[in-house]
C-alpha cells in the first residue's frame, strides 16, 4: 500500500505546558478545527476528548499522553495538500514529568503553552529544560488572553528572563482581558478577528487599528531582524535597507526555529475560540517534518561502541521506539510507538533489540482522540499503537531482526516517595500483584517491591499525587481495594572516605569448594556520576577477566541494600586492583559474594552518610499571608531562595526536604484561608542532618 501523505507533510508535535495553562482545551480545539471531533469537549465539564481516563475527567488534569492523528489544510485552506498531524497531549503536573519526557523524546516539535496571566510557572521551567535536553524545536503559544491580568508582551519578557530564550513574536494581541479581540499578523501586517458564528474557524482579516500601528511596525522590525540573521545574504540585504519578502522571512524563520536558534511566539484564547487555527498554521509553517531533523542515532546491540543511524525513509530498515504502554479494557496492552524508519505491516515479526526477544505484531491502531482506527501498516514518521506485544517496556526499540539497532535509551528518574499498600481481603491479594505489575510496566517511574523483613508491598513514585492516582487506578481498573500506609521518604546513602577493602569468600564442604578473592579501592564517584563507576585495574591475570563482571555485579547488588540504613548507595567509585583465584574452586558466584562482602564493610570503613531528597518548592500566596508561609517553610528546614511579585500574588521559591513536606497541601491552605497554592518537584539529594540520620537508622533497625 502506498503512502497516503508524503513524509514532508507530517508534523509530530506535542502540546506541553504548566498544569493550568489551558493545554487540554487547546488540544480539544485542534481536534475540533481539524474536523476529527465535531463537538467541542470542555475540560470544565469533564468531557474533553483526550482526557480519557476517569480520574483525569474528575480532577480536570491530564495524566496519560494520548496520541492523536488529525489532518489540516490551513485556516484559509492555503495549503494545496493536507498535512498530517500526530498530536501528543502531555500532562503538566509535576508528578508526571516522566510522561512529558517520554513524549518529548519522540516528537519533532512542540507547542509550549503559557497562561497569559500567570506566565512562566515552575513546571514551565521543567518542561523547557526537558525540551532543551532533547533539542526539540518549539513555538510559544500564550493562551488565556481573555483572562484578567493577561499581557502577551509581559509573558514574552518573563520567558526571556527565566528561561533564557528570547521569543520572537510573529503576532501581537489586539486588546486583552474581556476586550481581547484577536491578533495582529506581523507577517501580512493585518489585524485578524474571529466570529462566534463559526466558533472561530476562519480568520477575518482587516486593517490594523491605527492606535496599534506603531507597536506593530516596531515588532515587525524585530521579527524581520531575527529572520535576517539566518544567513549572510539576507543580512546584507537587510542592512542595505532592502525589504525582505514575506516568502524569505518565512523560510528564514523556519530554518532558525528548526535549528533551535529562535522560538517564535503567538497568542490567543483557546477557550474563547480566538486563535487556534493560526497556531496550527504556525506548526506547518515553522515546525519540522520528520525529514527536516537529523537522522536518529543508535547503537549496535552486539557492540555498543558501533554507532548506527536511521533516516526518516520508508526504504531504510524498520526501526521504532516504544514510548508508552497503556492497558486497554478491551484489547489488552497497547504499545505506542514512533516509527523512525522503514515500513511495518500487521502480522510482521520484529525484534525487541534491548531484550533480544522476538515479537509478532498483531493488530495496529491509530488513535483519533478516543476513537481508534485499525490500520494495516505504519511507515517512517508515523505514531501508532501496536496490539499483541508480549514483553516491551517504555523506551525499548523494535526493529527489523536482520538489521538490529538500539535507539537512544531513555533515562528515568528514581522515585522519591514510598508507601506500603496492603490488600483489604484475601481475594484482593492476588489481583493486587497483577494490577501493580501492569501499572509498573506502563510507568517506569513507578516501582514495586516487597519488604523482605515485613513482607509488605512497597510502592514508590514521583510524588503524593502520582501514588494517589495509581492506587485509584488499581481500585477502578482492577477492582482491587487496598489500605495505604503513611508516605515514607526514599533516602539514599553515599560514602565520604576513600578506602581499600579485601573481599574473600572461601568455602570447603565436601566435593567442589568456593573461592573468590578481590581487593577493591572504594571512593566517592566523580562529579555527575549517580550510580556505580566501576574500574578494572587488575593486571597480570591475578583475577581472570571472566570473573570481573561478577565482581561488578556483587558490588551493584550490595549497593541496592545500602550500608548505613538499608537505603540504596549512590555515587560510588569502585576500582578492583588485586585478588587471587583457585583453578578448581573459583567461579562467578564466589567472586560475586566476595565483592558483596567487601562492599558491606563500607559501613565501618567508608564514612557512610544518609542523603535526603530536597524538593524545589514554589508557593504563590497573597501578600497578607506571606510572613506565615515563610515562617512555616523555615520551620520545615526550608531554605528560601527568593521571591517575586506576580499578578496572582507573591511567589516564594524555596528548597525543602521532602520529609518535611507531607501534608503541606492542607497546612498551606489553612494558613492562607485556602488562597495560597504550591507546587514542588524533586531537585537533588543532600546530606541529612545527624538527628534525622539517627532516627532513620533506628527505624530501619
Swiss-Prot record:
One of its GO terms (molecular function) is translation elongation factor activity. One of its GO terms (cellular component) is cytoplasm. It comes from the Bacteria. It is found in: Cytoplasm. One of its GO terms (biological process) is ribosome disassembly. Residues 8-291 form the tr-type G domain. CDD domains: EF-G (cd01886), EFG_III (cd16262), EFG_mtEFG1_IV (cd01434), EFG_mtEFG_C (cd03713), EFG_mtEFG_II (cd04088). Keywords: Cytoplasm, Elongation factor, GTP-binding, Nucleotide-binding, Protein biosynthesis. Pfam families: EFG_C, EFG_III, EFG_IV, GTP_EFTU, GTP_EFTU_D2. The keyword Manganese does not apply. GTP binds at residues 17-24, 89-93, 143-146. Belongs to the TRAFAC class translation factor GTPase superfamily. Classic translation factor GTPase family. EF-G/EF-2 subfamily. NCBIfam families: EF-G, PRK12740.1-5, small_GTP. HAMAP family: EF_G_EF_2_B. Catalyzes the GTP-dependent ribosomal translocation step during translation elongation. During this step, the ribosome changes from the pre-translocational (PRE) to the post-translocational (POST) state as the newly formed A-site-bound peptidyl-tRNA and P-site-bound deacylated tRNA move to the P and E sites, respectively. Catalyzes the coordinated movement of the two tRNA molecules, the mRNA and conformational changes in the ribosome. This is Elongation factor G. It comes from Pseudomonas fluorescens (strain SBW25).
Amino acid at each position: 500500500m502506498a503512502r497516503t501523505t508524503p513524509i514532508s507533510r507530517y508534523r509530530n508535535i506535542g502540546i506541553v505546558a504548566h498544569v493550568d495553562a489551558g493545554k487540554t482545551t487547546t488540544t480539544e480545539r485542534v481536534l475540533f478545527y481539524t474536523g476529527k471531533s465535531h463537538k467541542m469537549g470542555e475540560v470544565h465539564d469533564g468531557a474533553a476528548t483526550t482526557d480519557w481516563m476517569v480520574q483525569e475527567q474528575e480532577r480536570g488534569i491530564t495524566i496519560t499522553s494520548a496520541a492523536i492523528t488529525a489532518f489540516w489544510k490551513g485556516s484559509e485552506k492555503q495549503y494545496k495538500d493536507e498535512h498530517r498531524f500526530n498530536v501528543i497531549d502531555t500532562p503538566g503536573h509535576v508528578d508526571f514529568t516522566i510522561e512529558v519526557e517520554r513524549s518529548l523524546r519522540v516528537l519533532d516539535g512542540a507547542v509550549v503553552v503559557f497562561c497569559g496571566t500567570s506566565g512562566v510557572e515552575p513546571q514551565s521551567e521543567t518542561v523547557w529544560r526537558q525540551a532543551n535536553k532533547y533539542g526539540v524545536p518549539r513555538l510559544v503559544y500564550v493562551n488565556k488572553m481573555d483572562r484578567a491580568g493577561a499581557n502577551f508582551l509581559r509573558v514574552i519578557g518573563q520567558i526571556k528572563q527565566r528561561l533564557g530564550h528570547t521569543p520572537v513574536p510573529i503576532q501581537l494581541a489586539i486588546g486583552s482581558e474581556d476586550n481581547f479581540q484577536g491578533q495582529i499578523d506581523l507577517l501580512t501586517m493585518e489585524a485578524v478577528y474571529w466570529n462566534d458564528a463559526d466558533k472561530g474557524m476562519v480568520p477575518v482579516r482587516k486593517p490594523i487599528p491605527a492606535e496599534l500601528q506603531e507597536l506593530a511596525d516596531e515588532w515587525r522590525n524585530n521579527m524581520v531582524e531575527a529572520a535576517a540573521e539566518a544567513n549572510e545574504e539576507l543580512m546584507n540585504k537587510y542592512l542595505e535597507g532592502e525589504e525582505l519578502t514575506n516568502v524569505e522571512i518565512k523560510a528564514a524563520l523556519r530554518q532558525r526555529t528548526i535549528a533551535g536558534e529562535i522560538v517564535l511566539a503567538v497568542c490567543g484564547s483557546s477557550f474563547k475560540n480566538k486563535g487556534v487555527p493560526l497556531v496550527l498554521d504556525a506548526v506547518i509553517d515553522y515546525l519540522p517534518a520528520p525529514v527536516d531533523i537529523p537522522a536518529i542515532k543508535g547503537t549496535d546491540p552486539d557492540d555498543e561502541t558501533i554507532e548506527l543511524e536511521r533516516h526518516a525513509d520508508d526504504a531504510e530498515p524498520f526501526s521504532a521506539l516504544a514510548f508508552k504502554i497503556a492497558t486497554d479494557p478491551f484489547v489488552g496492552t497497547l504499545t505506542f510507538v514512533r516509527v523512525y524508519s522503514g515500513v511495518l505491516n500487521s502480522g510482521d515479526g520484529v525484534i525487541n533489540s534491548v531484550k533480544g526477544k522476538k515479537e509478532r505484531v498483531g493488530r495496529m491502531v491509530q488513535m483519533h482522540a478516543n476513537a481508534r482506527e485499525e490500520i494495516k501498516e505504519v511507515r517512517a514518521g508515523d505514531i501508532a499503537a501496536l496490539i499483541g506485544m508480549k514483553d516491551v517496556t517504555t523506551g525499548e526499540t523494535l526493529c527489523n531482526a536482520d538489521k538490529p539497532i538500539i535507539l537512544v535509551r531513555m533515562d528515568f528518574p528514581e522515585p522519591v516517595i514510598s508507601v506500603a499498600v496492603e490488600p483489604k481481603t484475601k481475594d484482593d491479594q492476588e489481583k493486587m500483584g497483577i494490577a501493580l505489575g501492569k501499572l509498573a510496566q506502563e510507568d517506569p517511574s513507578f516501582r514495586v517491591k516487597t519488604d523482605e523483613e515485613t513482607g509488605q508491598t512497597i510502592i514508590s513514585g514521583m510524588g503524593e499525587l502520582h501514588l494517589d492516582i495509581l492506587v485509584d487506578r488499581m481500585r477502578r481498573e482492577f477492582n482491587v481495594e487496598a489500605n495505604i500506609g503513611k508516605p515514607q521518604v526514599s533516602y539514599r546513602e553515599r560514602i565520604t572516605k576513600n578506602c581499600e577493602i579485601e573481599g574473600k569468600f572461601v568455602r570447603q564442604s565436601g566435593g567442589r569448594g568456593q573461592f573468590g578473592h578481590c581487593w577493591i579501592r572504594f571512593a566517592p564517584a566523580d562529579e555527575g556520576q549517580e550510580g556505580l563507576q566501576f574500574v578494572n585495574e587488575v593486571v597480570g591475570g591475578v583475577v581472570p577477566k571472566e570473573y570481573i563482571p561478577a565482581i561488578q555485579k556483587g558490588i551493584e547488588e550490595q549497593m541496592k541494600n545500602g550500608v548505613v540504613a538499608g537505603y540504596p548507595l549512590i555515587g560510588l567509585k569502585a576500582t578492583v586492583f588485586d585478588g587471587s583465584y583457585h583453578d578448581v574452586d573459583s567461579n562467578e558466584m564466589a567472586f560475586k559474594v566476595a565483592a558483596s562482602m567487601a562492599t558491606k564493610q563500607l559501613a565501618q570503613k567508608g564514612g557512610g552518610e544518609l542523603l535526603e531528597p530536597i524538593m524545589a518548592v514554589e508557593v504563590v500566596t497573597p501578600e497578607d499571608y506571606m510572613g506565615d508561609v515563610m515562617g512555616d517553610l523555615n520551620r520545615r528546614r526550608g531554605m528560601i531562595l527568593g521571591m517575586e511579585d506576580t499578578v496572582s500574588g507573591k511567589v516564594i521559591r524555596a528548597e525543602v526536604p521532602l520529609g518535611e513536606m507531607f501534608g503541606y497541601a492542607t497546612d498551606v491552605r489553612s494558613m492562607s484561608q485556602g488562597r495560597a497554592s504550591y507546587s514542588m518537584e524533586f531537585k537533588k539529594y543532600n546530606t541529612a542532618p545527624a538527628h534525622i540520620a539517627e532516627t532513620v537508622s533506628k527505624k530501619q533497625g
